[in-house]
Amino acid sequence: MQIIKRNGTTESYDREKIAVAIRKSFISTQKEITDEAVYTIVDEVEQFLHQNEANRSVERIQDEVERSLMEHGFYAEAKNYILYRWQRTERRKVLSQIITGTGDDTIANILKEIQKDFSGKEYSLTFLAEKFTSFCKPDMTSGERLAALVKAAVELTTQETPDWEFIAARLLNFRLTKKLTEQAEAAGIFSFYDKLRYLTDEGLYGNYILASYTPQEIETAAGFMCPERDKLFNYSGLDLLAKRYLIRTRSHEPIESVQEMYLGIALHLAMPEKQNRLQWVKKFYDILSRLEVTMATPTLANARKPYHQLSSCFIDTVPDSLEGIYRSLDNFAMVSKFGGGIGMYFGKVRAAGGNIRGFKGVAGGVIRWMKLVNDTAVAVDQLGMRQGAVAVYLDVWHKDLPEFLQLRTNNGDDRMKAHDIFPAVCYPDLFWRMAKRDLNQQWHLFCPNEIMTVKGYCLEDYYGEEWEQRYMDCVNDSRLSKRSMSIKDIVRLILRSAVETGTPFTFNRDTVNRANPNAHRGIIYCSNLCTEIAQNMSSIETVSTEICTEDGDTVVVKTIRPGDFVVCNLASLSLGHLPLEDEKQMKEKVATVVRALDNVIELNFYPIPFAQITNHRYRSIGLGVSGYHHALAVRGIRWESEEHLSFMDKVFERINYAAIAASSELAKEKGAYHYFEGSDWQTGAYFIKRGYNSPEWKALAVKVSTQGMRNAYLLAIAPTSSTSIIAGTTAGTDPVMKRFFLEEKKGAMLPRVAPALSDKTYWIYKSAYLTDQTWSIRAAGIRQLHIDQAQSLNLYITNEFTLRQVLNLYLLAWECGVKTVYYVRSKSLEVEECESCAS
């Protein structure tokens, strides 16, 4: 039996559709109806249909259902059924209105899907149609009308109706898919393999993908793609992906879908796998496309492309020589050229007024060199995309410290300023102890070159008690010139700069080096641009320079000792999207991302050879997290609570355990990192220092000692400012700044909504500026026990904070064992986000 639909087409009769509609009318009155009664009414409707062949329409069927309900005395249900019919009619009308307005019939299915998935009255498409109509103009093209429809959904997003952002994302994805289909048809692309061939021929894809996989393997991998996962994105995330990460043609048209991007990255990251490679492609694709893990911005942007620089950040130790300083500047320029940020340690460079080759008082000091760093950051602007990003670190005992602390402030001599770099200070325990005890005590500043000349050692090469003994030895040595200041004056300079500019960043060097699992191979002088990396460092040195003849030509050959030029390979677990209580699943997902990061080391395009050498010696990775506040909110856990501290203590211990176990299994499969022997991993000291003495931990320590570790360093919590937007979650381990706000981007106001915002989570999402910062610091201290590197910890202050209160936060961070502090964010201060480390 065929039924005539409203649009004139026919479909086969399905009695279950009538039964479902009848049951819905009873649900709304909270009455029960037996299946027998339901099908009695259905039978009556069917009897009518058999008797009236010429009038078998949807509308006539619904009339008969109403009549039958009333005949059986179900008057309230009949009324609800009539209301249901009216609502369906109104939904069809608004659907038709939007379709007519866009001039695109193909959007109907998306709109019906939206009506089904967002059934609340506040998400009625009537609101969308009204807003859309107000934007439409007669001379608009079809593309402009679709853009206006997306804009209408975006503007309907509020903290009371946050899901409009997901509706906007679906409409944006429809628009993107439509463009991609047009591009594919024009280019003769009919399969994923066709697309990779086209992108490779156009120089938009690295040829290594097609060289590594057969056409059959690529088509098999194409079957892994799940377009349904596009629905996981909110508008902000999808818009950011579309504008900055998806591959575009030379004419700037999109040529890659979101799922194709994730599969392309997965294909690239799985290339080093010798066995079950497609299985790893699928695992990598799944954790990325489900938004459970985000790779660092450079990996997300550059994997699968010809210039596949996948690392976020680098750290260089600037030596105290003209050649060395300019080499470091060159290193920075090359890193910046390929989209990386850098941390530079200037603690070895002689201070202003120091001696050069016996000439007294002629050294210009570190500020002059930092101005060159500043100009390099501005000049090498990453193909016009954004200027370079660099943090410069100086020890708190360096003679040039007072001027250094005023690099970015607005007062003082502009010739001594460098507004485009990010200063950071390295503190020993002694400084904080003295600051806590008595701010009026004297602190003494030295020139590192003078200490080396007079004392025969570099003070910065020591930490802890040995550093303190040598520092006091320098203080008491009359041969050394000292610049003495009260700790109060130094602290005042630090805090004023922090409140005014958000910097200097803080690096607690004794805390860092005591916990260094690879102290047998060196020392950690400083961190990176975002303060989450803590790895062994040493200067690059020229050993010799020779003039040689090669193929009849005269060439100059330099022999260079590569030092330890740190590389940051980052990814983040999206805690808000992960089953944190499911230990088995968490172990599997952590193991998958650890393997992916280890493969980054093999696959990376290195801007300078020193980075490649260090990366292969240590094989360091930085697995971090995002969605920290998100994870707390969906579980109803308040930030300012002991429950928060206890819960995250367990979570980070599990993550650490899973990461160590995964790295050890990789070592068994592929070999341990070069310097494993003698490390705290090998001796077991790593586990003893952290009090990991349960049977499970002890068994893991034995396994690590026997099997080795694939990676010298494992965990580091980056800020994730960009990639957390993509994943639709909260940034890093920060509390949200606001539950809802509008952000201006290129003349448009974009809504930013706290993830999973609802009546249940609204009060859990307390603003960072209203949150007691001592809870954030205590939480960071608890996490730090389980993190072998560091974390990007921001402090949020209001205009009511006194300098003493800010100092107390720094002291508490040091006392809690926090290794680094990133920005001090004042409500009146705009600070630049680091996109390089936005993993």
Predicted regions and their residues:
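Terminal amphipathic helices with adjacent charged low-complexity linkers/tails
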Residues: 80-87, 164-196, 427, 512-535, ...
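Catalytic alpha/beta core of large soluble enzyme barrels
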Residues: 214-220, 230-239, 531-535, 597, ...
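Core nucleic-acid recognition elements
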Residues: 9, 31, 36-263, 267, ...
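Alpha-helix capping and helix-loop boundary segments enriched in small/acidic/polar residues
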Residues: 9-13, 33-36, 101-102, 140, ...
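Internal maturation/activation junctions in enzymes
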Residues: 287, 305, 329, 589-612, ...
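Function-dense linear segments that define catalytic or interfacial modules
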Residues: 247, 253, 260, 265-277, ...
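Conserved, charged catalytic cores of large soluble enzymes
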Residues: 181-272, 358-372, 384-388, 393-528, ...
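Short acidic, glycine/serine/threonine-rich loops at helix termini
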Residues: 160-161, 327, 348-349, 354-361, ...
